[in-house]
């Protein structure tokens, strides 16, 4: 079927590299199983959503390398990478993946801190008198 599809996904500071190849459903995330790295069922369901659209989740092996950011950022970055890898394999899935929002990269980033302020938008306490 396929040799191997490699794709990258990003969200905030999280970067995920996903390798998709035909196999028997083995998923490796930074040397751990998917259940060990992402313990919550909601996170695992979010990540595997693009594969579920293909049909058989157990007919592919995934090797995922993820770094940076928080857990939820890593989940969304991995989902984007997986959707892009699926798209390389089945280009006719583009409309369905796009309709679900799996191919959309969330552009929101942390706003920089400004001088004269405590944080990006929070000011120092103001005393009228």
From Swiss-Prot:
Pfam families to which the protein is assigned, alphabetical: Ribosomal_S9
Key words of the record: Ribonucleoprotein, Ribosomal protein
A GO MF label: structural constituent of ribosome
Disulfide feature: none
GO BP of this protein: translation
GO cellular component: cytosolic small ribosomal subunit
UniProt feature, compositional bias: Basic residues: 110-129
Protein name as it appears in the record: Small ribosomal subunit protein uS9
Organism: Chlamydia trachomatis serovar D (strain ATCC VR-885 / DSM 19411 / UW-3/Cx)
Top-level taxon of origin: Bacteria
Region of interest (Disordered), residue spans: 97-129
Cited InterPro entries: Ribosomal_Su5_D2-typ_SF (IPR020568), Ribosomal_uS9 (IPR000754), Ribosomal_uS9_bac/plastid (IPR023035), Ribosomal_uS9_CS (IPR020574), Ribsml_uS5_D2-typ_fold_subgr (IPR014721)
Alphabetized HAMAP family for the sequence: Ribosomal_uS9_B
Family statement: Belongs to the universal ribosomal protein uS9 family.
Recorded name of the encoding gene: rpsI
Stored PANTHER family: RIBOSOMAL PROTEIN S9, SMALL RIBOSOMAL SUBUNIT PROTEIN US9M
PROSITE patterns per the UniProt record, alphabetical: RIBOSOMAL_S9
Gene3D superfamilies for the chain: 3.30.230.10
């Amino acid at each position: 079927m396929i040799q191997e599809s490699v794709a990258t996904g990003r969200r905030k500071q999280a970067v995920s590299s996903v390798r998709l190849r035909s196999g028997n459903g083995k998923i490796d995330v930074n040397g751990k199983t998917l259940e060990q790295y992402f313990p919550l069922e909601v996170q695992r369901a979010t990540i595997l959503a693009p594969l579920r659209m293909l049909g058989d989740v157990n007919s592919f092996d995934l090797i995922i390398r993820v770094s940076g950011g928080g857990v939820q950022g890593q989940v969304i970055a991995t989902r984007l990478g997986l959707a892009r890898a699926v798209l390389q394999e089945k280009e006719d899935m583009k409309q369905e993946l796009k309709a679900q929002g799996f191919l959309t990269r969330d552009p929101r980033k942390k706003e920089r801190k400004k001088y004269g302020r405590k944080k990006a938008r929070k000011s120092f306490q103001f005393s009228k008198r």
